[in-house]
């Protein structure tokens, strides 16, 4: 392995001069710099990024932990993180936890040992003790999509308000019996979406019927659960699904039960994934700015890493709430006609 001393020997200068010439931050005579660069090229010298990072106090790497890379939400978010990090000269290490909080803890410890400059975390679990420990360690941390507490920097959407607007739209277009197909209530975002569903009903004077609220922790069980629900009782007017992957299974279950979307049952999702306009029928859904959320998380973590916050207000935990939008397509209809 070629070292900085080898470059110094070939260039006829000291190792410290090679270090200054290659860093580009400390003035070095141009002729000396050219000799160093020529020697480095000749020897195919690659600087030791870790050693350089330890010396400077940074490694130029950011850890990104996501709960399920197969969930179509997270590739879009990850792309936003990576594209933005690259613009600022950072490399992203991606870790997938499979929705397992123990794997999440393990990755956090491994990333800390690898001297990453900060961690962006879309948490997989309901526990927050290890996240509190992480933030108290002093390592920059930003929570993404799934936030826990306002005392940790986070980028998310107002799930409560977005869900309320979706339900209000259904009610405004003549739907009264509205089923909610929700995820694991142990996760903040699903609790918030459920609260928005309840608020939408309450504000319209519709009494909440607990039998219309389906909690389905595993998205792959959505189809069977909805089929069983439809087989056991009269059809609802609409189904509000807490995610687009759930909405896709809801639509298939509705059709296989002999109903039509939206003629018999309207369906609304939450995400606006790239596939949503191409479903049959195209899916009405709440749009989350997923790529932009990833980009915002990267910008915030880099701001922490580079110490750009100079005032107490700027250093205080920041929860950035991104705007959502209800995208109306053909999976819902107006029942007031």
Residue ranges and their predicted role:
Residues 45-118, 195-198:
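Amphipathic helical "hinge" segments at domain boundaries
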Residues 85-96, 180, 198-220:
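Short beta-strand elements in bilobed, periplasmic/extracellular small-molecule ligand-binding domains
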Residues 99, 121-165, 186, 245, ...:
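Flexible loop/hinge segments that line or gate small-molecule binding clefts
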Residues 155-180, 192-199, 219-227, 247, ...:
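Hydrophobic alpha-helical segments within soluble ligand-binding/sensing domains
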Residues 223, 227-337:
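Flexible loop/turn connectors
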């Amino acid at each position: 392995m070629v070292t900085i001393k080898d470059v110094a020997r070939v260039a006829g200068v000291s190792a410290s001069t090679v270090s200054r010439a290659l860093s580009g931050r400390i003035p070095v005579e141009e002729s000396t710099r050219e000799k160093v660069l020529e020697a480095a090229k000749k020897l195919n010298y690659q600087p030791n990024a870790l050693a350089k990072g330890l010396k400077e106090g940074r490694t130029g790497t950011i850890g990104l932990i996501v709960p399920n890379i197969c969930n179509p939400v997270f590739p879009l978010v990850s792309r936003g993180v990576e594209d933005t990090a690259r613009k600022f000269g950072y490399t992203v290490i991606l870790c997938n936890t499979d929705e397992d909080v123990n794997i999440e803890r393990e990755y956090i410890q491994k990333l800390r040992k690898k001297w990453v400059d900060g961690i962006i975390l879309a948490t997989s679990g309901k526990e927050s003790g290890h996240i509190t420990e992480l933030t108290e360690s002093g390592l920059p941390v930003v929570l993404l999509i799934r936030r826990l507490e306002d005392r940790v920097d986070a980028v998310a959407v107002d799930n409560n308000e977005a869900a309320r607007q979706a339900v209000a739209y259904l009610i405004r277009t003549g739907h009264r019996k509205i089923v909610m197909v929700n995820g694991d209530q142990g996760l903040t975002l699903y609790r918030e979406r459920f609260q928005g569903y309840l608020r939408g009903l309450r504000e319209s004077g519709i009494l909440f019927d607990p039998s219309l609220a389906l909690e389905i922790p595993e998205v792959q069980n959505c189809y069977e659960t909805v089929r069983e629900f439809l087989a056991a009782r009269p059809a609802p007017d609409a189904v509000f699904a807490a995610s687009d992957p759930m909405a896709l299974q809801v639509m298939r279950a509705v059709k296989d039960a002999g109903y039509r979307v939206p003629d018999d049952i309207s369906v609304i999702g939450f995400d606006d994934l790239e596939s949503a306009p191409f479903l049959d029928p195209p899916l009405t859904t709440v749009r989350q700015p997923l790529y932009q959320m990833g980009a915002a998380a990267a910008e915030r973590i880099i701001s922490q890493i580079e110490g750009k916050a100079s005032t107490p207000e700027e250093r205080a935990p920041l929860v950035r709430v991104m705007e959502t939008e209800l995208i109306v397509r053909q999976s819902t209809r107006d029942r007031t006609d």
